Amino acid sequence: MKLDPVSTENVTYAKSSLGLKMGSNGQKVLGLSWDFEQDTITPELTAIAKRAEDLPATKRNTPRLLAGIFDPLGMIGPTTITAKILFQEACRQKINWNDPLDGVIKQAVEAWIESLIECKLITFDRCLYKHVREEVLECSLHGFADASKKAYCAVIYFVYQTSTGSYSKMLTSKTRVAPLKELSIPRLELITCLILAKLMSTVKNALNSQVSVRKQNFGQTV
């Protein structure tokens, strides 16, 4: 598949299509910050971290803070899955909803809250071809899936080739916490394979089948 070269003019979608003024600090929507000038998206979770300062560290408040994170594409999956694992551990220890957390769990929750502030250092390009200045010769989807005793994940990358080399960008991911009832690694990886297959189908349909599925890697067991 061949695509037309991207325009060399430094004009962002915000300026050319939406008529938004440049030079501002960007637009913040649902915890995401859109930089008009650079045409990048950054998860802004500092407000949630500050909110946590006024809340006691309890089992109830962990999912309460997690619910404030808007990440439909799973771009910060490692951050959200950590909170889910900690909440599951609190359930495993049969901690009451309003009882204060202590020990290792409390320290882990506090470390997770601090990591929310660091998410502002993560930036994603809104446009997949943002820095491409030559003709795209081929593009494809590459999927990866794996599982552990605590969680499992599927992730899809968009890979495209030009005359100067190959480039890849993460498109989306799905993360899940392993069930409280312990399952074997092979069974968890089979579940992960199903998630990857569904996610790949969704992404391909969203792109109107303009790309091919070149590679799907699963865990070593499956």
What do the PLM-derived regions correspond to, one by one?
Residues 139, 143-168:
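Acidic, metal-ligating active-site segments
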Residues 53, 57, 100, 179-187, ...:
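Alpha-helix capping and helix-loop boundary segments enriched in small/acidic/polar residues
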Residues 19, 130-134, 142-144, 207-208, ...:
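Beta-strand elements of modular eukaryotic interaction domains
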Residues 1-5, 195-222:
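RNase H catalytic domain
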Residues 22-135, 140, 155:
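C-terminal reverse transcriptase regions that engage the nucleic-acid substrate
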